[in-house]
Amino acid sequence: MIANLPEEAYAIVEGRHADPFRYLGPHQENDRTVVRAFLPEASMVDAVDEHGGTATLERVHDAGLFVGLLPNGSGRYQLRARFGETTVDLDDPYRFPPILTDFDLYLLGEGTHQRLYDKLGAHPLTLDGVDGIAFVVLAPNAQRVSVVGDFNFWNPRRHPMRVRGSGYWELFVPRALAGDHYKFDIIGPHGQQLPLKSDPLAFAAEMRPDTASVVVDPARLSHPRPAPPAINALTSPMSIYEVHLGSWRRKDDNQWLSYRELAEVLPAYVRDLGFTHVEFLPVNEHPFDGSWGYQPTGLFAPTSRFGTPEDFIALIDACHRENIGVLLDWVPGHFPDDPHGLANFDGTALYEHANPLQGRHMDWGTLIYNYGRTEVVNFLVSNALFWLERYAVDGLRVDAVASMLYLDYSRPAGGWIPNKFGGRENLEAIDFLRRFNTEVYAKFPHATTAAEESTAWPQVSRPVEYGGLGFGYKWNMGWMHDTLDYISKDPIYRKHHHGEILFGLQYAFSENFILPLSHDEVVHGKRSLIGRMPGDAWQRFANLRAYYSFMFAHPGKKLMFMGCEFAQEREWNHDRSLDWHLLEQPEHQGIQALIRDLNGLYRRLPALHQLDCDGYGFEWIVTDDADRNVFAWIRKGNDARARCLVVANFSPSVYHDYRVRVPFPGKWREVLNSDSAHYGGSNVGNIGEVQTLDQLVPELSLSLPPLGVIFLTPED
């Protein structure tokens, strides 16, 4: 070992050099080209130029630091290294040009690079005729970042990266391959060694409990075929089947179905029941099964639990072949503090807030994104665009929006920090959501976004230019809570809660609403929907049939969690399949048949969907019959005769000669009756059609089934 090495040499050997290109690789010294290479465990290294000339490099440090001159002065070269009895020709990663352009760095610096996924992460690349992988990661406060993986025996001294403007670290690793596992080895700002970090922009990851990122070649990801462009329009029917991929169905040994196995059965099932969309609970990589995906660590990676990115594309493609739109639950509000993830990524609060009064979610123990950082907002917006572009999904439903909007969300007095105006609104989160929606709709005008927002925040689904947040839809949590509270009560008490049904129409058109019967309503001791229904067995199923019919007749798009369509008895359990054996029982078959017919009617009748989000499309007919628990209303479409009369009887009594006024004289056909024997009901109804009693003041005399809802349309 030569004694008088420069400090930079020791920094390389000790794995703490922040800019290894300044010392390693080729360097002009006078008229000569000096090559320096650090190859731990190598006993001998030669530099071999493109003409075959060879020069032996001198070992100047026992750790594996070699120095010498290029044989012909300059040009391309390889390193021929001897490891024990094996000789290997290597391309020197420190002879290649930068990966990020000056324009990339400019956009990254101002937080407007809209395609982070094309630059950051791991990307196959050919430089100077050499194939390899380009690695880029943000770590502005790190002293040193190395990429470690299968290609270097996970040795952090082997491939230290160089830092570019704004704290982006990069390195091209020759001969690294798609399929290689990798992580980032980071030394923090105070010299502290951090846990190995997964790539925030990795396109794939190992199966938990392992946490390495996996190199994916984006060129191998075929683009799914698109869904019909009008599938998300406000005037189109939208009936969403919400699915947790790990528990919809399972194999006999309780193992998951893969993405490709799901592709063979799920789209056909959804099509058969008449749903227009599926919505997947988060598919992003996540370490904890019990989070259901809502605590993701890999926002750009579909979870490896069910297969590869190519396999997930096959599932999306299968849905699109059936003209089924695909929506993803998306979680930009918080992330877990697992040591391999985003938390304390570069030894500082890079993605989160440093102050726990701002940065930690009290309910979930997770960390909250710092929307005041341009890098964080750029990361999240790019992720949204990534799923819409690369996977051709049709929309994103944003989770837990209320927790993003309010600084005091679920916090005690004194446990939060006001905004600059002294208020509780998270101004940076508002700006982020507006930018997210603006960029999504600008680039994907046929896509949609939906907000799970549980407060009365105004204009969630109104355009940004009019002061709104810019979402396409908002979940109507108030409707869900009020109506479930009503229907779960014994009918004898419902007259005292008549307003819970009426109240929803006071605000039904203030937003573009989705009526959600989601996974959150069938867990944590709430019981299944059928489990909430009062009465004996027959009444429970009749109540549920009436409630579902009421939902499909109510203004707003529809969402139903898996299992609800056949009256799953148990609460949902993410660790096991739905109870498909229940479909051997007639009453459960009846619920499923009703959902199929409700979806069919909803899609077929413009009156039930065209004006879901427009007050012109709804008119109350009966609101004052609380004693008999009866409601009636008209749904309207754009055409003058596109009308549907809906009468709901939430009493177990049968009412004959019940008079209801209608807009047109003549015959009205009973197009659906939730009490039909086909669905398990008592078959009380109107024998298919009813004639108005008076031509001047048209009125129908109806038989109202017990705990039933009927739909009638005028005959042409």
From Swiss-Prot:
SMART domains: Aamy. The active site is at 399 (nucleophile), 452 (proton donor). Pathway: Glycan biosynthesis; glycogen biosynthesis. It comes from the Bacteria. Gene3D superfamilies: Glycosidases (3.20.20.80), Golgi alpha-mannosidase II (2.60.40.1180), Immunoglobulins (2.60.40.10). CDD domains: AmyAc_Glg_BE, E_set_GBE_prok_N. GO terms for cellular component: cytosol. GO terms for molecular function: 1,4-alpha-glucan branching enzyme activity; cation binding; hydrolase activity, hydrolyzing O-glycosyl compounds. InterPro entries: A-amylase/branching_C, Branching_enzy, GlgB, GlgB_N, GlgB_N_E_set_prok, Glyco_hydro_13_cat_dom, Glyco_hydro_13_N, Glyco_hydro_b. Keywords: Carbohydrate metabolism, Glycogen biosynthesis, Glycogen metabolism, Glycosyltransferase, Transferase. It is an enzyme of class 2 (transferase). SUPFAM superfamilies: (Trans)glycosidases, E set domains, Glycosyl hydrolase domain. Monomer. Catalyzes the formation of the alpha-1,6-glucosidic linkages in glycogen by scission of a 1,4-alpha-linked oligosaccharide from growing alpha-1,4-glucan chains and the subsequent attachment of the oligosaccharide to the alpha-1,6 position. Belongs to the glycosyl hydrolase 13 family. GlgB subfamily. PANTHER family: 1,4-ALPHA-GLUCAN-BRANCHING ENZYME. This is 1,4-alpha-glucan branching enzyme GlgB. It comes from Rhodopseudomonas palustris (strain BisB18). The gene is glgB.
